[in-house]
Amino acid sequence: MIHQPPAGARDLLPLEVAQKGWINDCLQQVFQRWGYQRIVTSTIEWLDTLMAGGAIERSTVIQLQDTSEGTLGLRPELTASIARTAVSRMADSTYPQRICYRANVFRNPPPGYHGRQLEFYQAGVELLFAGGLLADGEILLLVADCLETLGLTDWHLILGEAGLTRSLLSVFPDPLRQQVRHCLAHLDYITLENLTYPSADLRERALLLFDLRGNPADVLSKVASLELEESDRIIVNNFKSLIHLIEQSHPNPLPLILDLSLVQTFDYYTGLVFKVVSSSDNQLRVLGQGGRYDQLLGLYHPQHQSAPGIGFSLNLEDLHLCLLSTSSSGMPRQIPVIDWLVIAQTTQSQVAAFNYAQLLRNSNTLVRVALDLGGRSPEEIRDYARTCRIKTLVWIGEDGTPRIETVQ
């Protein structure tokens, strides 16, 4: 089996690398324009770090061999690792920390899905030690800026509120509450409808939660009709203020959907949660996800001091697939071509060929220069150049004199 990658792994060839590199570069430029600094965390972490106090299922983590000090794992996402880093290396900061990243993550597939992809690529940001309306608004507007910079148009921003959803779920007894939550997280209406409920009222409440999605004003009107605690009414009012803020702060109407049944797979979120979805090419893709996690940093603090945080990650694979079907995108459709091919015509001119190629490479602008490695006739070299879209050949004669030829 050494001639194949393991199940769930895949190789990226030059064109895909160039395209995903372009996506990453665009996103990093947007992050930097908003004042975010890149961080690099370890791919390998202690399993306890990665599980974020139980918010991330142990089965999700690809685990490595136990050591004498504990079990290691490959990160299934970046937020927990960045939270650990922030608490251990940036804990003295009382001002907001704006952090961005581009990295790979690893996840075990669900049971029964052998062969599903294990390694994923993400780019994202974390806004740490900052809470409140302005921080939430900054993150949502930054998401929109990222998607617009990439040239994507057919997308929606789905908003939810983890605290309010937990409150609405609190009427269900355990373990039914976990079953309802799982159905909401995976949009499994059939299973939700057929769960065993202690009363018809609870069944009706579960189905109502599933349907709390749509135009923000309409959904908030439905929620207002429910019997809510005072703390929940404050959340609803804050949500109204947030939606007003981002709608007034963006030059064009944002494609917002309010979905109070939205439950993220990772359970460390405490406030605003959101997903970015696209329906291009008649396929629904999740382009990104994020939310507020005001208790997570406290898990890694020696005195368990909490600090607010909010962030998001964008999924490079899904962004790439959407951009492939978007003709207006600036993503490259071909690998960069070689600008110059330098050919030593004799053994005596090989040193001169290397020197001339290096002279071309020393240009102030990026110039791609390759050296012909011999063994081909002049016509075979020209055929190769046409196939590879090489525009210019440089023939180095025996005396070291270059002769430039434009390929027709």
UniProtKB/Swiss-Prot annotation:
Disulfide bonds: none
Domain of life: Bacteria
Subcellular locations according to the entry: Cytoplasm
Alphabetically ordered keywords of this record: Amino-acid biosynthesis, Cytoplasm, Histidine biosynthesis
CDD domains in the cross-refs: HisRS-like_core (cd00773)
Pfam families: tRNA-synt_His
GO CC terms: cytoplasm
MF annotations from Gene Ontology: histidine-tRNA ligase activity
Main location: cytoplasm
Amino-acid biosynthesis in keyword set: yes
InterPro entries membership: aa-tRNA-synth_II/BPL/LPL, HisRS-like_core, HisRS/HisZ, HisZ
Pathway: Amino-acid biosynthesis; L-histidine biosynthesis; L-histidine from 5-phospho-alpha-D-ribose 1-diphosphate: step 1/9
Keyword Amino-acid biosynthesis attributed: yes
Biological-process GO terms, alphabetical: histidyl-tRNA aminoacylation; L-histidine biosynthetic process
HAMAP family, per database record: HisZ
Subunit description: Heteromultimer composed of HisG and HisZ subunits.
The family this protein is said to belong to: Belongs to the class-II aminoacyl-tRNA synthetase family. HisZ subfamily.
Miscellaneous information on this protein: This function is generally fulfilled by the C-terminal part of HisG, which is missing in some bacteria such as this one.
Function description: Required for the first step of histidine biosynthesis. May allow the feedback regulation of ATP phosphoribosyltransferase activity by histidine.
Annotated NCBIfam families: hisZ_biosyn_reg, PRK12292.2-3
Protein name: ATP phosphoribosyltransferase regulatory subunit
Protein source organism: Gloeothece citriformis (strain PCC 7424)
